[in-house]
Amino acid sequence: MNAPDSTLVKAFLLDLQHRICNGLEALDGSAKFAEDAWKREEGGGGQSRVLTGGTVFEQAGVNFSHVMGASMPASATAHRPELAGRSFEAMGVSLVIHPNNPHIPTTHANVRFFIAHKDGADPVWWFGGGFDLTPYYPYLEDVVEWHQSAKSLCEPFGDEIYPEYKQWCDEYFFLPHRNETRGVGGLFFDDLNKQGFDTSFAFMQAVGNGFLTAYAPIVERRKDTVYGEHERQFQLYRRGRYVEFNLVYDRGTLFGLQTGGRTESILMSMPPLVRWEYAYTPEAGSAEAALYSDYLKPRDWLTL
């Protein structure tokens, strides 16, 4: 089978959402996800699952959406003018996890499928996705393990995949106005279709399935680390970068808002609490300073 099959993709995505939510509930140990099913007037809908006030996770959102429309939004046709005049179908699972403990990194993952149709023409389709890690306090062990997990899931698809998608992630999750990366990266891919549907779908599944395998050990390792108000305030300050990136640069956020997507689901990635501070400068020699100097820039984490 090499023709695109959106039914197959949707079944995988719904199962992935279910498995990730179960895994996060097990990690948290107390809180449960609340599900909010929704429909979109223009076509499609989804189910948003949100966990709040947990022992480990302050907020975790895992969203499935499947939307369709008769014409493409400006955010899509700007990059792909050949899509103008086509109907479209977009589906995906997107998640963001904001832990309580500043020693546990925030993380984001997304896997998605897009297909556009036009009478008398072949469909235009592709997969996209990835995952990335945003630590507040620098633990080299965690970052190396995260990138090793990313590299391992890429290896069956070719030796060039990890370095290419790792670089793409570094470049995508970058805040030009801050001149820093959002975190320590991971994988990012888009427009994936050149290898045909089966191989492209298999890679997307590997990324989706690999997320919790990469993240759970870091949570287990850091969840009982003692912290105080100083660390909490720094975490809230650094969360501001998440807000800045998502509202100014993130293509998925812009696409969702321009297509009349569900605002609550689109903005599910926002941290529940955040703060800004004028001209913040970390204390020299501190762990906070090490984050800025050593972690918020692209690095080859596997050959240090």
UniProtKB/Swiss-Prot annotation:
InterPro entries: Coprogen_oxidase_aer (IPR001260), Coprogen_oxidase_aer_sf (IPR036406), Coprogen_oxidase_CS (IPR018375). It catalyses: coproporphyrinogen III + O2 + 2 H(+) = protoporphyrinogen IX + 2 CO2 + 2 H2O. The keyword Manganese does not apply. One of its GO terms (biological process) is protoporphyrinogen IX biosynthetic process. GO terms for molecular function: coproporphyrinogen oxidase activity; metal ion binding; protein homodimerization activity. One of its GO terms (cellular component) is cytoplasm. Pfam families: Coprogen_oxidas. PANTHER family: COPROPORPHYRINOGEN III OXIDASE, MITOCHONDRIAL (PTHR10755), OXYGEN-DEPENDENT COPROPORPHYRINOGEN-III OXIDASE, MITOCHONDRIAL (PTHR10755:SF0). This is Oxygen-dependent coproporphyrinogen-III oxidase. It comes from Shewanella halifaxensis (strain HAW-EB4). The gene is hemF.
